[in-house]
């Protein structure tokens, strides 16, 4: 719902400012580029407005929706939360993605164990994730490595934000422990319980 509201406001801003907001299959590459550039300007403007209006829940919902790359809404929003010491909002923004990546990894681990009984952790650690993702083949071990890398990247980014915001030491240690057990693949579903914060 928030994504729809956000997109409508971007479209309205583009129209109000005489910028292109709709394209056709017949558009030239230049027209398409101009429209996409205008759309990005509109996104930045509406993001700025919503942040000024403190529409944080709606922006977090947009970030969680996955419609935009992280650098479009997620990262500017996280940086705003850090700069303004909005710890609860930062938690709500960041924990969900981490939790979902870990849950996807755990689900794939469960499937792998049902087929093979033992999990080859060393093989998973040695998988070149970018090459695996670029390829066309599917394997449980490749998927586990992909979700593990995604979760670790998200956790590392989150730790950086937490250090900047001077998060409570106990909570920061919990996140660092989560990083360790994701890295060594010893994590269990119950380990995610502290990471279900909601505003």
Where are these regions (language model features)?
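Generic helix N-cap/helix-start motif at coil->alpha-helix transitions
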Residues: 32-40, 67-75, 101, 134-136
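N-terminal alpha-helical interaction modules that lie
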Residues: 1-67, 198
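Alpha-helical junction/boundary sensor with strong preference for TPR arrays
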Residues: 50, 54, 101-104, 162, ...
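TPR repeat positional signature
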Residues: 43, 74, 94, 120, ...
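Conserved small-residue packing positions in alpha-helical repeats and bundles
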Residues: 47, 78-79, 98, 114-117, ...
């Amino acid at each position: 719902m928030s994504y729809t509201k956000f997109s409508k406001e971007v479209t309205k801003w583009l129209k109000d400012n005489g910028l292109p907001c709709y394209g056709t299959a017949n558009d030239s590459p230049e027209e398409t580029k101009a429209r996409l550039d205008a759309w990005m300007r509109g996104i930045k403007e509406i993001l700025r407005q919503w942040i000024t209006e403190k529409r944080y829940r709606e922006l977090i919902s947009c970030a969680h929706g996955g419609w935009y790359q992280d650098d479009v809404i997620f990262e500017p929003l996280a940086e705003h939360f850090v700069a303004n010491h909005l710890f609860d909002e930062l938690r709500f923004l960041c924990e969900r993605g981490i939790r979902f990546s870990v849950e996807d990894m755990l689900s794939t681990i469960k499937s792998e164990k049902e087929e093979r009984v033992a999990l080859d952790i060393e093989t998973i650690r040695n998988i070149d994730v970018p090459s695996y993702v670029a390829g066309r083949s599917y394997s449980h071990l490749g998927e586990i490595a992909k979700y593990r890398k995604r979760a670790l990247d998200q956790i590392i980014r989150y730790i950086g934000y937490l250090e900047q915001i001077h998060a409570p030491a106990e909570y920061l240690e919990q996140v660092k422990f989560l990083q360790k057990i994701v890295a060594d693949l010893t994590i269990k579903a119950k380990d995610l319980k502290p990471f279900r914060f909601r505003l």
